[in-house]
Curated annotation (Swiss-Prot):
The keyword Cell cycle does not apply. It catalyses: tRNA(Gly) + glycine + ATP = glycyl-tRNA(Gly) + AMP + diphosphate. PROSITE patterns: AA_TRNA_LIGASE_II_GLYAB. One of its GO terms (biological process) is glycyl-tRNA aminoacylation. This is Glycine--tRNA ligase beta subunit. It is found in: Cytoplasm. It comes from Listeria monocytogenes serovar 1/2a (strain ATCC BAA-679 / EGD-e). It is an enzyme of class 6 (ligase).
Length: 688
């Protein structure tokens, strides 16, 4: 037989951004508890609002199933005394397992006999186990938590009520003075207490008290009301999953309404208006069918349709004050020139160990010009780099960015255009912050891409130089994001920038600037390792086999686009019939070539057979062609070498007793191995 179980944690209003993750955590912890306690169950449903986290477990068994358990005890030589009687160790084991010593048996495990017992365990009633769920509730962790009253428990918000019901039976436990019951609380203003007769009644009982406990139903209700308003007003309300998720978790009983603001505010930059509405007020902006922003907004009320006009006027008043402030900030910003803004950057500390923003911009300028040289950019392009890196952070001192930090770069672009900067420079000011997430949009212009790479690499290496590095999950300065973003941009542009050399030169630059606390060699090695680990993440995102990732990163990790191409091509051909014998042959070359001693050059006059000459000829052709070959052509060239390599090893004793012959043969293999290892560490690839 089975019953349903309901667990509700009633709380003061939680931050909306943590509601969904918290209820999913509760679901997992309850699922794990049921599994650990060997209680069978059916479907688990989750419900959540800003004031409650709930799981409803359907079909929970009324008792654990009876089961047979085995337990291993001490070895036989310890379990029996000299007279063959049970020792204290054996008797203690039997007592701990609650079995009669007569039930003990022996079992051979890898040549050693141990005591074993088999015992039938009678399942306990579920209702006697459920009170221990109190530990599940109190063990939850949250990004933010608090104490309240005299309690030691830290929780996302104070617990106000608890429900724990196994069908009609209330499961008793208590947390911070709150005892479980079958009574929930309805909407804070519209509802009353709700008595739950049995778990399956829970959603409807709360709905009667103006609480939609199913988050997906609340979200769908909001979407339907938005679409209805769109149709009625001939508006366009653009989909915004993040905002929709947030407002869903801000309300218990959603009602959509609209409001208006003065048309003159449309003269503000659209981004300022939208950010004011979305980020500060959680309003949906309204557009015409042509995509133009309109002087209206849509919001979601936590309540019913009563007095919507009054609610709308209240929201309009709040937004009007926000927009008035934004307009003032914008007008003040327009009075300031870019040069005046740049002058203020020397008073803003980037980091206490890395100087001011002005000093950082100068370092980034050097890095950007270095990268431009590697890419053979023209003098005109370099002049754009100089102008850009002299000003690209200027909007950080503007009033709008001070009020709306998320508009950094965007406002820089707008202000730069208004003050007559080149469009390419203005665009790069915005793009240098990209990507702003793991899968975020990349810069679309060359100048924006270059400055984004330079800024991110200088940030990354600068912090490493002063021994500030990510540890575990802690990365307060976003260095993983900087590294990942820089490599994504390099890959997307296909720029063959020699990363190891660039890292070395930036570290030397930081040393010259006086902003380094560690030996240069240590910093260079740590940054290289850090970037290699970020490369692993990128390659894993391309679904590359782990052994192939190890192989290409163990090869030449210097040029990122080529490395990624090598990994993808090896991965694509890993199942080809020729792949295994080719990798085996190349790996054999690399392995034996490790015995080569420096200083010996290949002398064809010492060849004793045609197979040495054939391999030498193939190697000479490879040397001549290699630089002009594509990645796939290089792999095919290695594959074409396979039969020649096999024939060479079948007919040539590399480790000859004659040192001159041996060293000559090792020199030949070493030259070939240098090409192979640049492509990948072939012996890392699993072909078995």
């Amino acid at each position: 037989m089975s019953k349903d179980f309901l667990l509700e944690i009633g709380l003061e209003e939680m931050p909306a951004q943590y509601v969904t993750s918290s209820v999913l955590q509760l679901e997992k912890r309850v699922t794990d508890w049921l599994t650990e306690n060997k209680i069978e169950f059916g479907e688990i449903k989750t419900y959540s609002t800003p004031r409650r986290l709930t799981v409803l477990v359907e079909g929970m068994a009324e008792e654990q199933a009876n089961r047979v358990e085995e337990a291993k005890g001490p070895a036989k030589k310890i379990a029996l005394d000299e007279e063959g009687n049970w020792s204290k160790a054996a008797l203690g084991f039997a007592k701990s397992q609650k079995v009669d010593p007569a039930d003990l048996t022996f079992r051979d495990i890898k040549g050693v006999e141990y005591i074993y017992i088999k015992k039938e365990v009678i399942g306990e009633k579920t209702s006697t186990l459920l009170p221990s769920l109190e530990k599940v509730v109190t063990s939850m962790t949250f990004p933010v938590s608090m104490h309240w009253g005299s309690n030691d428990l830290r929780y996302i918000r104070p617990i106000k009520w608890l429900i724990a019901m196994f069908d009609e039976e209330i499961i008793p436990f208590e947390i911070t003075g709150v005892t479980t019951s079958n009574t929930s609380r309805g909407h804070r203003f519209l509802g009353k207490s709700a008595t739950i007769k049995q778990p399956s009644d829970y959603p409807n009982a709360l709905l009667e008290q103006f609480v939609v406990v199913n988050a997906e139903e609340r979200k769908q209700a909001i979407v339907e009301q938005l679409r209805e308003l769109e149709s009625m007003e001939n508006w366009q309300i653009k989909e915004d999953d993040d905002l929709l998720e947030e407002v869903t978790n801000l309300v218990e009983y959603p009602t959509v309404l609209s409001g208006n603001f003065e048309k003159e505010y449309l003269e503000l930059p659209e981004e300022v208006l939208i950010t004011t509405m979305k980020e500060h007020q959680r309003y949906f902006p309204v557009f015409s069918q042509a995509g133009e922003l309109l002087p209206h907004f849509v919001t979601v009320r936590n309540g019913n349709h009563e007095n919507l006009d009054t609610v709308a006027r209240g929201n309009e008043k709040v937004l009007r004050a926000r927009l008035s402030d934004a307009d003032f900030f914008y007008q003040e910003d327009l009075k300031m020139t870019i040069d005046e803004a740049v002058a203020k950057l020397q008073n803003i500390v980037f980091h206490e160990k890395l100087g001011t923003l002005t000093e950082k911009m100068k370092r980034v300028q050097k890095v950007a010009l270095m990268l431009a040289d590697y890419l053979d950019w023209q003098e005109e392009d370099k002049q754009d780099i100089i102008r850009l890196t002299n000003i690209y952070k200027f909007d950080l001192v503007t009033n709008i960015v001070g009020e709306f930090p998320e508009l950094q770069g965007l406002m820089g672009e707008k202000y730069a255009l208004l003050q007559g900067e080149k469009p390419a420079i203005a665009t790069a000011i915005r793009e240098h912050y990209l990507p702003n997430s793991a899968e975020g949009e990349l810069p679309q212009t060359d100048l924006g891409s270059l400055i984004a790479i330079a800024d991110k690499l200088e940030t990354l290496i600068g912090f490493f130089c002063v021994n500030i590095v990510p540890t575990g999950s802690a990365d307060p300065f976003g260095l993983r994001r900087s590294a990942f973003g820089a490599m994504r941009i390099i890959q997307a542009n296909g720029w063959n920038i020699p990363m190891l050399e660039v890292i070395s030169r930036i570290v030397d630059m930081e040393r010259a600037e006086g902003s380094t606390e560690l030996p240069d060699a240590d910093v260079k090695k740590e940054v290289q390792t850090f970037l290699k680990n970020r490369l692993r993440v990128i390659l894993q995102g391309h679904h590359i086999r782990h052994d192939i990732i190890d192989a290409v990163i163990g090869g030449d990790p210097n040029v990122i686009p080529q490395l990624i191409d090598r990994a993808q091509i090896l991965n694509e051909h890993a199942e080809a019939e020729w792949f295994r014998p080719t990798i085996e042959a190349l790996s054999r070359v690399v392995k034996i070539a490790k015995k080569y001693e420096d200083g010996v050059e290949v002398d064809p006059a010492l060849f004793e057979n045609e197979y040495e000459q054939a391999l030498f000829d193939k190697l000479e052709k490879l040397k001549f062609d290699y630089a002009g070959l594509t990645i796939i052509e290089r792999l095919k060239a290695f594959a074409d070498l396979r039969t020649t390599i096999d024939a060479y090893f079948d007919n040539t004793l590399v480790m000859s007793d004659n040192d001159e012959l041996k060293n000559n043969r090792l020199a030949l293999l070493f030259e070939l191995a240098s090409f192979i290892k640049e492509f990948a560490q072939m012996d890392e690839i699993n072909v078995k």
